[in-house]
Amino acid sequence: GKSYFSKIAGEVENPQSAGALLRSPFEFAQHGQSGMWVSEVMPHFAQCVDEVVMIRSMFTTSITHEPALFNIHSGRLFPGHPSLGAWVSYGLGSESQSLPAYVVLEDSKGPPINRNQNWQSGYLPPVCQGTRFRSTGAPVLDLHPGKDVPDQMIDLERDLIGELDRIHLGRRPHQPSLGARIANYELAARMQIEASEALDLSKESLATKAMYGIGEDKTDSYGRRCLIARRLVERGVRFVQLFIDGQIWDNHTSLKSGLQGAC
């Protein structure tokens, strides 16, 4: 994650250096009615600090990427435990019959460290895990049949597969992953229209797109995913998670220029 000391905290005392000050390269000022300290590198965030909740009590006992990502998603340092989105999906379900309860929007530049283990369901039913959507092009790969296949043939094929699935599941009642897989296929059929509509930003106004930074080189990709996330929530998705380019905050060197470029 981004450096807390260079973005939010201001000057702090380093207990490892016998009282010496570890100063951020950025200047800080208080903002909003809350008086939250925010550095100069986040001018837009500084304007809306009273609209966010700042959690200052979080910490990790790991210094490496993989366990830290497991920790922030599931509260544990190792894989195999449900992610936060999976718990929300398990507890609340989905308000939509045509969209998953938990959707993941990855960065177009590539998946995050740990990949799909970040949104796993662990020991909860597999249906609670995140469903990955793409923010450009087809939201879900291979969701639509070939153009030359008649609709009537698609319906007959779907009914036949559904009947075979029910027979197969009846012979294996103690395999929850099988039931989840069948449910995912049924959901995929319903998603063919709903998912494409949710990711279609063409009907959004120019003013709305501008608010999300769509059309600007540095903000277009993430802004599109933010707007898509809002549209998914409006359509009943309970939990939407956005990932950003790989290790953009991994500033081992060139802290000042690295953070400024990332922000």
Kindly give the residue locations of the regions a language model identified.
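Ligand-binding pockets and gating/stacking loops
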Residues: 1-263
